[in-house]
Amino acid sequence: MMALRKTKPTSPGRRAVIKSVNSFIYKGKPFAALTEKKKKNAGRNNSGRITVRHIGGGHKQHYRIVDFCRNKDDIPAKVERIEYDPNRSAYIALLCYADGERRYIIAAKDIEVGSYLVSGSSSPIKMGNAMPIRNIPVGSVIHCIELRPGKGAQLARSAGSSAQLMAKEGDYSQIRLRSGEIRKIHISCRATIGEVSNSEHNLQSIGKAGAIRWRGVRPTVRGVAMNPIDHPHGGGEGKTAAGRHPVSPWGTPSKGSRTRKNKRTSNMIVRSRYSKKG
């Protein structure tokens, strides 16, 4: 069972900590054949310049190679264990297929160690099974959804996320995402039944600044505390306001301004996430 634990305030750093405690999470090391080294570059590019701010330090991590395609069809796989993955908010499950191959997948909510999963057009409608959208009943809750057939899951992959299959018309289905957006997706694209695991992720509290540093995140400096060369809000004598609407260091409005540029796929959006909810 998933549970949240609030620590006793034995120190200021422990006072605000709320963490999830799950007895089913595997305590050992990951499956070595499905891990890769992960080099840290502290947000710098090949010339040493900072290209992504607020990145640096943190605990050493290995990348887990996750199967987002789920293309090993009609071969049952046993859930050997469910693991923590430092690279994502969801848990991952190690599957052992009947032919001996092992793969990591995004763990669906309520799947258990020892249960069997299968992917393919003929697989039953069961939590954690993957299949083309054409084989999924309308109204089903799904996750790990492909945008192009065979490319691998791109939508609804983070902890607790899901989408709902609303309709099927011809070669396309209509899927409602958590944001409220309704999007057309080809029925040959694959999706997994159910909701993503670790739905209590958003209820956790890090508790102290150092725990964020363990994750490789560095502090964020306010623009008004900088010099004018560093930020549009910088400069001034003493403490001063920004003097303009909030913007990023590059002048882009930073409070909800839309920046989407991909007009090529705009015709696939049936209902925008910004439209008023009735």
From Swiss-Prot:
How does it associate, per the subunit comment? Part of the 50S ribosomal subunit. Forms a bridge to the 30S subunit in the 70S ribosome.
The segments labelled Disordered in the record are: 226-278
Name the source's superkingdom.
Bacteria
- Keyword Plastid present in the record's keywords: the answer is no
Gene Ontology biological process terms from the UniProt entry: cytoplasmic translation
Check the record and name the InterPro entries matching this protein: NA-bd_OB-fold, Rib_uL2_dom2, Ribosomal_uL2, Ribosomal_uL2_bac/org-type, Ribosomal_uL2_C, Ribosomal_uL2_CS, Ribosomal_uL2_dom3, Ribosomal_uL2_RNA-bd_dom
Q: Which Pfam families does this UniProt record tie to the protein?
A: Ribosomal_L2, Ribosomal_L2_C
Name any one GO molecular function: transferase activity
Purpose of the protein: One of the primary rRNA binding proteins. Required for association of the 30S and 50S subunits to form the 70S ribosome, for tRNA binding and peptide bond formation. It has been suggested to have peptidyltransferase activity; this is somewhat controversial. Makes several contacts with the 16S rRNA in the 70S ribosome.
HAMAP family cross-referenced by the UniProt entry: Ribosomal_uL2_B
Keywords in alphabetical order = Ribonucleoprotein, Ribosomal protein, RNA-binding, rRNA-binding
Species for this entry: Nitrosomonas europaea (strain ATCC 19718 / CIP 103999 / KCTC 2705 / NBRC 14298)
Q: Which PROSITE patterns match?
A: RIBOSOMAL_L2 (PS00467)
Q: What is this protein called?
A: Large ribosomal subunit protein uL2
What family does the entry list? Belongs to the universal ribosomal protein uL2 family.
Q: Which GO terms describe its cellular component?
A: large ribosomal subunit
